[in-house]
């Protein structure tokens, strides 16, 4: 071929042959994948209610994303480095879009959402069967043969969400390992921390948009346009209320496909940033091709794979970094996945408010932390040892500060027969709760239905019938229940739909909880960039793509997949009252024992994150005991430039054994 054709094949379209343009596109891809992931997490409670499933199944759905990622992560990370990385990233974005579309499909296949209730939307006499009446048996509407529960197609529609999430995970696989290795290969070493900081900001701007989108969709009723919302008998804070969860997934699908387009125009390789490399651009391109061909002829791709795996496994700092990451991910996934649920049940917020607060008080501080951390690493040229120490101290500070949340507790909502007696005396979670009392035994009430009402006496009751209410006035959510025999001792005997509101003291504690969340998020994000640079610099240059992928593999199989499942199982154990499907089988949990829920939600992640600082401590010890190449006080960027220079000399001699230690690479032994 002629020289022009050769250069065109190497550098592609001129406007795309710049590392900063690729960085911009990759930042958008990071934002898009983070948008999809965060929106999925914000909608887990909505999905749980829509499909009437337990929290453990929701955890399985959430972990299915990691299953899809796990299927390909190591092979994509290693073999993808030897292929056209931008095109593989573009294909991944398009596959993510397909997965998001599949997740939204059940809405169009299931029909309207029918929540569990005995209450009729109007108060006419012919529809008052949900009230306390002697010699009449209540029924849950509509009823169905329990044997049909398994056969009902709609009961298994959550599998579409599971499969779509797996496909979304497959699509995300190439973005991080191939994108970061691409930047590491062609960016100036001194710019690398700053570029990674920009990518991390992209990972935050996506969630910010997702929080806004999730909060907006949660305010819209799931079947908007096809039902009269004035006839609904559930309030926004009701645990049966479901928002338009499917809209956001359609938005994510379109955005992922749109963002995939630019990656098909980037070249396979870039000229290295810097004037000295630009001058020798053609020479370096030819040298890279020659060296790659020589390596493949001598050892082969598969042999390299196992040699790199062995090298990484014998690198103690790398292995300790992976262990630290696994423990950190277990704690982070547990906190982030169920944070909306915690805000709803512990502080009495609606789904929309919980999603909005989670984003408002978490994401901006994380974004600022990433930017400041990346800027400091670039500006002051932090050494490897200082970076490790800074990361450790900031992480420990965040972990200790988060323990203050244990003091910001709210009490259980007083629910007669569950958390309190009918006389208002608080009951223990371990006690056998009895929802029937002398005031409602004559009413022949259903005991498994969830239709909560709040009485004038400040107590909530599971249904109007169990409150002993005999009359109703009004319609929809404005309905008022009167002549309630279980409330009469307070002087009034009326009730309104929904649980009673949390007190002002609980609202104040929520504000302190959110303020602590801001500082914890900021400290945690400050610690990530220095810690991640230690992780990147402890590997040989040619091992980075595989090393990143192997770390992601471990984090997903030991954290991303398992954490939401076992965490969901533990949360289910704190459930006080399960919902009921139309066929009578248990559905989603309607209310939790708050003290037990809080202990699991805050305690388990604190234990996991706290234990992660033990291997981190050994990393500090190893870095102090062993000498790094060159001056031990040299900055991270100088260290990387040395690695790149010596990597070049290594490639010049293709017969050199991979077992030989390179003077410019980190080699430590326990």
Curated annotation (Swiss-Prot):
Q: What does the record list as GO biological process?
A: bile acid and bile salt transport; bile acid metabolic process; cholesterol homeostasis; heme metabolic process; liver regeneration; monoatomic ion transport; multicellular organism growth; sodium-independent organic anion transport
Q: Show the segment(s) annotated as Disordered.
A: 276-295, 647-670
Chief location bin: membrane
Q: Which InterPro entries match?
A: Kazal_dom, Kazal_dom_sf, MFS_trans_sf, OATP
Protein name, entry field: Solute carrier organic anion transporter family member 1A6
Residue numbers on the Extracellular membrane side:
41-59, 112-155, 225-242, 334-353, 406-513, 572-605
Q: Indicate how the chain sits in the lipid bilayer.
A: Multi-pass membrane protein
Which species is listed as the source? Rattus norvegicus
């Amino acid at each position: 071929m002629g020289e022009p054709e050769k250069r065109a094949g190497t550098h592609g379209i001129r406007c795309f042959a710049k590392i900063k343009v690729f960085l911009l596109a990759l930042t958008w891809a990071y934002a898009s994948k983070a948008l999809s992931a965060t929106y999925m997490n914000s909608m887990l409670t909505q999905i749980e209610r829509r499909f009437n499933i337990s929290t453990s199944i929701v955890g399985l759905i959430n972990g299915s994303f990691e299953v899809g990622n796990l299927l390909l992560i190591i092979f994509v990370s290693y073999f993808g480095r030897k292929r056209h990385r931008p095109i593989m990233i573009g294909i991944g974005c398009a596959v993510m879009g397909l997965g998001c579309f599949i997740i939204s499909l059940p809405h169009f296949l299931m029909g309207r959402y029918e929540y569990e209730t005995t209450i009729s939307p109007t108060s006419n006499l012919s529809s008052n069967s949900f009230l306390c009446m002697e010699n009449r048996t209540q029924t849950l509407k509509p009823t169905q043969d329990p044997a049909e529960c398994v056969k009902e197609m709609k009961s298994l529609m959550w599998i579409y969400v599971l499969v779509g999430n797996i496909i979304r995970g497959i699509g995300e696989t190439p973005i991080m390992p191939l994108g970061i290795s691409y930047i590491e290969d062609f960016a100036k070493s001194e710019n690398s921390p700053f570029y990674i900081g920009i990518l991390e900001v992209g990972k935050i701007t996506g969630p910010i948009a997702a929080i806004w989108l999730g909060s907006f969709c949660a305010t819209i009723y799931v079947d908007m346009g096809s039902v009269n919302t004035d006839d609904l008998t559930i309030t926004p804070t009701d645990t049966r209320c479901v928002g338009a969860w499917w809209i956001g997934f359609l938005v994510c699908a379109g955005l992922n496909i749109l963002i995939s387009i630019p990656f098909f125009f980037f070249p396979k390789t870039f000229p290295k940033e810097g004037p000295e490399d630009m001058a020798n651009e053609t020479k370096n391109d030819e040298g890279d091709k020659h060296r790659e061909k020589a390596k493949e002829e001598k050892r082969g791709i598969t042999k390299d794979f196992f040699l790199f795996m062995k090298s990484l496994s014998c690198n103690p700092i790398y292995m300790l970094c992976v262990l630290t990451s696994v423990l950190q991910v277990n704690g982070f996934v547990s906190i982030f996945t169920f944070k909306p649920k915690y805000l709803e049940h512990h502080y009495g917020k609606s789904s929309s408010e919980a999603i909005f607060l989670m984003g408002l008080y978490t994401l901006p501080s994380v974004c600022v932390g990433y930017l400041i951390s990346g800027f400091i690493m670039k500006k002051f040229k932090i050494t490897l040892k200082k970076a490790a120490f800074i990361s450790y101290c900031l992480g420990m500070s965040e972990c200790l500060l988060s323990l203050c949340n244990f003091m910001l507790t709210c009490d259980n909502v007083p629910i007669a027969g569950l958390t309190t007696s009918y006389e208002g005396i608080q009951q223990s979670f371990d006690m056998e709760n009895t929802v029937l009392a002398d005031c409602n035994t004559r009413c022949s009430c259903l005991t498994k239905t969830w239709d909560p009402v709040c009485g004038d006496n400040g107590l909530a009751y599971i249904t109007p019938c169990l409150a002993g209410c005999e009359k109703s006035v009004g319609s929809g959510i404005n309905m008022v229940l009167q002549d309630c025999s279980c409330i009469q001792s307070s002087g009034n005997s009326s009730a309104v739909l929904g649980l009673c509101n949390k007190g002002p003291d609980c609202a104040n504690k929520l504000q302190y909880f959110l303020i602590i969340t801001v500082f914890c998020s900021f400290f945690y994000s400050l610690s990530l960039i220095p810690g991640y640079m230690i992780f990147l610099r402890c590997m040989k240059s040619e091992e980075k793509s595989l090393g990143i992928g192997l770390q992601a593999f471990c984090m997903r199989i030991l954290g991303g997949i398992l954490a939401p499942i076992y965490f969901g199982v533990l949360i289910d154990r704190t459930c006080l009252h399960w919902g009921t499907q139309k066929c009578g089988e248990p559905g989603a949990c309607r209310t939790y024992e708050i003290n037990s829920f809080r202990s699991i939600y805050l305690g388990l992640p604190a234990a996991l994150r706290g234990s992660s600082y033990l291997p981190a401590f050994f990393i500090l010890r190893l870095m102090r005991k062993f000498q790094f190449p060159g001056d031990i006080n040299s900055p991270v960027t100088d260290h990387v430039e040395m690695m790149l220079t010596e990597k070049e000399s290594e490639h010049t001699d293709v017969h050199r054994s991979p077992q030989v230690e390179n003077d410019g690479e980190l080699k430590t032994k326990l």
